Amino acid sequence: MAISMRGRAVEEANRQHAARIVFHTEIRYSPDMKTRFARFSSLLFLLGSLTGLAAANPPFTGGRWIDLTHEFSSETLYWPTAERFTLETEFHGQTPKGYFYAANRYRASEHGGTHIDAPIHFAEGHKTVDQLPIDQLTGAAVVVDVSARAQKDADYQITVADLKAWEERHLQIPNGAIVLFRTGFARHWPDAKKYLGTDEKGTDAVAKLHFPGLHPDAARWLVSERTIKAVGLDTASIDYGQSTLFESHRILFEKNIPAFENVAALDQLPATGAYIIALPMKIKGGSGGPLRIVAWVAEKP
C-alpha cells in the first residue's frame, strides 16, 4: 500500500516537472525584455558580490599591532667589528623647479640593530635572506621569558629545562611556531655598555661582550624535538656574548632556521597568542639584513 502511494506521488511530481519545462520553453522574450533581464542579472551579481565583501572578516581586527623593531640611527648598536649605521643627506630642500625634494643614502653592516640572520651566515650552502619563504617569517609566536635569570647573570644561557618548564606552564610548542626569547636586555638599548657588556670597538672588544643567549643544547633540542620556523631574542646574538664557537647559530642554521636578533618590546607580548610578521630587506645573496618585525595581539574576550 505504502509502495503504491509512493509510486503515484513520484509519477505526479514527474508530470508537474515536465509541464514546467514545456511552459518555460514556450516563453518568447522580446529584445527589450532580454536587455532588462541582463541588466537585472548584473545587478543581482553586483549586490551579491558586495554582500560577500561586507560579510568577509577583514584580517587582524579586534586587537593591536606592536612594533618589535628598534629604529635605525647613529645610536643603533652593532657588533664591535661591524660598520655602524650612517645616514647621509643627498638632497633636502627646494629644487630649481620650485618643489620640495628629500633623499638620503645609508651605509651599514647587515648584522646590526633589529635584523635577521639568514642560515648562510653560519651554514655554507644554506639559504640566503632572499631565499627565505614568507611563510617561514610569519606565524604564531611563543615567548619564553627568562628575564629573571638573565637579570642576575649577564652570561645566562637559555636551557632545555627553561623550554620544558615553559611547556609545563602553557602547552607544547606548536609545530610551525616562531620561538622568541625575552631576556629583558632590551631595556638597556641603546646603552652599549649595559646591552653588550662593552662600548669599545674593534677586534679586542669582542672578548668583552657579555649578554644572554641560547645554549647549544637548547638549540639542538628545538631542532630535534620540535618543528619551528624561526627563533628570535632581545640581545645582540643567538649565542651568548662569551661564545667563541657560535654553536647555537650553527645548529639552527644547518636546519635552515633563521634568527631574529636585537628584537624590541618582547615584554609587551603574551606567552602565547601573538602573530609575528618579520620582513627583512630582500638582499640577493645576503647573509642577513635589517628587519622590520611586528606582532599582532588579539584583544582578550
Description of each model-found segment:
Residues 41-52:
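Bacterial N-terminal signal peptides
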Residues 30-43:
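Bacterial N-terminal signal peptides that target proteins for export
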Residues 55-301:
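Active-/binding-site microenvironments in catalytic and ligand-binding cores
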Residues 6-7, 11, 21:
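Short, low-complexity, intrinsically disordered N-terminal modules
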